[in-house]
Every structure is written in structure tokens, then in C-alpha cells.
């Protein structure tokens, strides 16, 4: 359906698509935050990808972390698009292709980051508690398949965003917006919106968070009995998961609130005006991961040590530990 047909078939003002306006100070402040997040994130993740991908020994741990950095980078490269949108007071001038693709990447890489963190949590638990299973299945081929499946699922979950995003023109206000358009019938549109929000909340937040919390609870329980302190790779993952939840929880909470606020004009306006601020918090996660790595390494290293060498050692420590643990398994046990 063309943009003109969409314009003629829906009463856009009744949906509230074109009432979002901010003060110049707020828009400029948000744009500065987005710009800083973009610069810090792109540089930081590029450094991580460069060292892990091209300088260091390849291990399963580095394979997981480089995919996490890749997901963050793909998320970050479209932040300038959103920054322009905010600076232009939410008038969309960049065409429908960028409207669809930027939203698709935001959604896909949100899922990819969460699923990768979930997979890393499961990997940490199995590495610590199931030596036979690790010895048998912790192979590159198996992990490539799992990571490939994570990306395929994330892309599939991002397809609805790609499909429903539209550039909508208001002839009465002479404004354009990049919005999710679910059809002319309001009841159908609200139903589709609620389904998408519920899928995003359950599959992209509740289920992964439950698996992560369960994995870490079991890890803590196990550590109490084996009297073995967590390694630095475990600490890095824990910090990254904590920050992810802190940054993305407001986004999901706001989406759930929106399910109950669609019939209230005041609540709808509050939700709509909160979106840029909630997005700003979510964007921070993709930029802060490299800072988390450095922060944890500096806390656990000597003052004069090289940060990147220490990070490399932290990721390799887990591989060494896993190998040593597996070497304790008797050959008769392996052959069963």
C-alpha cells in the first residue's frame, strides 16, 4: 500500500501519531546522548572485534563475545538515523527503506544480544558443573550451529518490524513519521500491536531472563560446595547481563504499560513521550559493554598490567579451566 493510500484511508490524528513534540533543549540533549553513545560504542566494539577476531587465539569464549560485540555494533550503526529523527522534531525525511531497516536492526539485535547472553549463561553453568557434557559437546562446530540458530531466530523475530514499519504523511499537518502501521481497522491494529508486544516481552525478556537467573542461581549453589571462586570471564558476563537488564527493562515495562494505556489519552501521551528517553537508556547498553570488560579487568588486575592482555587472559582462563576439569574425567567414563 502506498503512502498516499495509507494517508487517505486512516484518520491519523485520532491515533495520536502526530502530536509528539519536545522542547529544543530536550531534543538537543537527547541527540548529544545518542551521539556519545554511538561514538563510544562504535569505537569500543570495533576494538573488541579487532582484538578478538584478528589478534587473539580463537576459543569458544572469544567466539561468543565477538558475536555479542557484533550484535552491539549492528545496533549502534543506525543510532545516527534515530538522532536525525529526534533533531528534526520527529519528522521523517530519510525514506521508507531506512525507516524499515533501522527499526529491523534495532529489534533483531535486541533479541540477538539477549539470546547470546542467555546462551553464555548456560555455557558458564555447564562448564562449571557438567564436565562430561562439556568434554563431549563443547566443540566449535556445535557452537557455530547454536550461534547461527540464535541469529536466525533473532532475524525471524525482527521481520514483523520490517513488515509493519511505514512512513506516514499527515496532509493536515504536512508532517511525516516513521511508525508501525498495523492497518486501517483500529481494533485489528490494536490486536496486532498487543500480540507483538507480548511476543517481544515473553520471548525477548521473560524467558531469557528466567533462564539466566536460574543458571546463575545453580552456579552460586554449585560454587558454595566446590569452594572455587568465579573466574574473570564469569564476572564480565555477570556484569554485562546486569547492565543489559538495567538498560532494557524500562523498554519492556513501557511496552507492557502501553497495552493498558491505549484507551486512555493521558496515559497514551505519557507513553508516547517517554519512548525517546527509554530508547536512550536501551541504546546505552550496546555502547557500555567494552567499558564493562575494561572495568572488571582493572578491578581484578595489578595497576601496571596491560588491559587488553589481561582481557585475553581472562577469556583464555576459562578455556584452560574447562580443559583441566575435563582431563580429570576417567577414560572409562568418557567411553560409556
UniProtKB/Swiss-Prot annotation:
Coiled-coil intervals, chain numbering: none
Glycan-carrying positions: 5, 174
Keywords, comma-separated and alphabetical: Disulfide bond, G-protein coupled receptor, Glycoprotein, Host cell membrane, Host membrane, Membrane, Receptor, Transducer, Transmembrane, Transmembrane helix
Cysteine pairings via disulfide bonds: 99-178
Single annotated GO MF: complement receptor activity
Biological process according to GO: phospholipase C-activating G protein-coupled receptor signaling pathway; positive regulation of cytosolic calcium ion concentration
Record topological domains on the Extracellular side: 1-31, 85-101, 165-200, 262-276
GO cellular component entries: host cell plasma membrane; plasma membrane
Protein name as annotated: G-protein coupled receptor homolog FPV027
Record-stated family: Belongs to the G-protein coupled receptor 1 family.
Predominant location category: host cell
Membrane-crossing segments per the record: 32-52, 64-84, 102-122, 144-164, 201-221, 241-261, 277-297
SUPFAM superfamilies, per the entry: Family A G protein-coupled receptor-like
Highest taxon, organism lineage: Viruses
Residues in compartment: Cytoplasmic: 53-63, 123-143, 222-240, 298-336
Record's bilayer topology term: Multi-pass membrane protein
Cellular compartments annotated: Host cell membrane
Amino acid at each position: 500500500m502506498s503512502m498516499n493510500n495509507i494517508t487517505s484511508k486512516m484518520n491519523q490524528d485520532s491515533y495520536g501519531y502526530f502530536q509528539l513534540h519536545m522542547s529544543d533543549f530536550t531534543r538537543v540533549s537527547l541527540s548529544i546522548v545518542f551521539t556519545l553513545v554511538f561514538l563510544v560504542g562504535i569505537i569500543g566494539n570495533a576494538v573488541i572485534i579487532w582484538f578478538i577476531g584478528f589478534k587473539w587465539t580463537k576459543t569458544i569464549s572469544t567466539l561468543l563475545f565477538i558475536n555479542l560485540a557484533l550484535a552491539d555494533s549492528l545496533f549502534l550503526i543506525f543510532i545516527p538515523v534515530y538522532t536525525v529523527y529526534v533533531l528534526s522534531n520527529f519528522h521523517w525525511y530519510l525514506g521508507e527503506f531506512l525507516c524499515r531497516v533501522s527499526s529491523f536492526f534495532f529489534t533483531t539485535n535486541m533479541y540477538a544480544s539477549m539470546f547470546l547472553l542467555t546462551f553464555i549463561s548456560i555455557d558458564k553453568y555447564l562448564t562449571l558443573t557438567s564436565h562430561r557434557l562439556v568434554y563431549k559437546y563443547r566443540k566449535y562446530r556445535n557452537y557455530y550451529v547454536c550461534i547461527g540458530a540464535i541469529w536466525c531466530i533473532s532475524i525471524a523475530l525482527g521481520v514483523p518490524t520490517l513488515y509493519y514499519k511505514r512512513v506516514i504523511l499527515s496532509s493536515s499537518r504536512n508532517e511525516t513519521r516513521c511508525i508501525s502501521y498495523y492497518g486501517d481497522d483500529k481494533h485489528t491494529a490494536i490486536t496486532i500491536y498487543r500480540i507483538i508486544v507480548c511476543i517481544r516481552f515473553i520471548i525477548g525478556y521473560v524467558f531469557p531472563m528466567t533462564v539466566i537467573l536460574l543458571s546463575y542461581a545453580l552456579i552460586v549453589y554449585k560454587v558454595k560446595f566446590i569452594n572455587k571462586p568465579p573466574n574473570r570471564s564469569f564476572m564480565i558476563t555477570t556484569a554485562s547481563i546486569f547492565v543489559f537488564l538495567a538498560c532494557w527493562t524500562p523498554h519492556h515495562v513501557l511496552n507492557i504499560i502501553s497495552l493498558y494505556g491505549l484507551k486512555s489519552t493521558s496515559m497514551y501521551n505519557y507513553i508516547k513521550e517517554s519512548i525517546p528517553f527509554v530508547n536512550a537508556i536501551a541504546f546505552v547498553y550496546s555502547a557500555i559493554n567494552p567499558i564493562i570488560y575494561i572495568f572488571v579487568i582493572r578491578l581484578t588486575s595489578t595497576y601496571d598490567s596491560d588491559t587488553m592482555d589481561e582481557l585475553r587472559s581472562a577469556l583464555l582462563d576459562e578455556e584452560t579451566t574447562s580443559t583441566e576439569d575435563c582431563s580429570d574425567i576417567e577414560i572409562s567414563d568418557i567411553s560409556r
